[in-house]
Amino acid sequence: MLVVGSKRIGVQADMPLEDVTLDNADMLILPGGLGGVKGISESAHAMQLIREAYAKGIRISAICAAPTILAKAGLLKGKKCVCYPDMLEELEKAGAVVCADSAVVCDGLFITAKAAGASEEFAFAIIETLKSKAAALNVKESICAR
């Protein structure tokens, strides 16, 4: 199954969303982009998976407009987070503590990032969360990151 994003980049999916379970999940990573975010938000199965992941203590990362999915799921009340600047009001309405000046925010089970420009920092936060700070630093150094 080929999924094509808003920038016309195709990604081969391992399986259809309907077949996804959380049996071996360490983290859900929600991609940004308005079209994809709209699609995820309108999918009852995706929203159920996200709520179930949270209930099971599975970490969830979201970048760009994707933190609004977490807001729609009712999961951000009192949580520190960030998203694409044009979408911050949606997070505030959901009771989130918006950190508009941050590129990446980690709070509890959530890692949120502002936009594609924060993707390096977002990736390192994910590595640090799933592995270790040392692993994140090792990757950062090996790719000559900023």
Residues covered by each model-derived region:
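Extended, subdomain-level signal for the structured scaffold at the beginning of enzyme domains
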Residues: 1-60, 68-72, 77-78, 90-101, ...
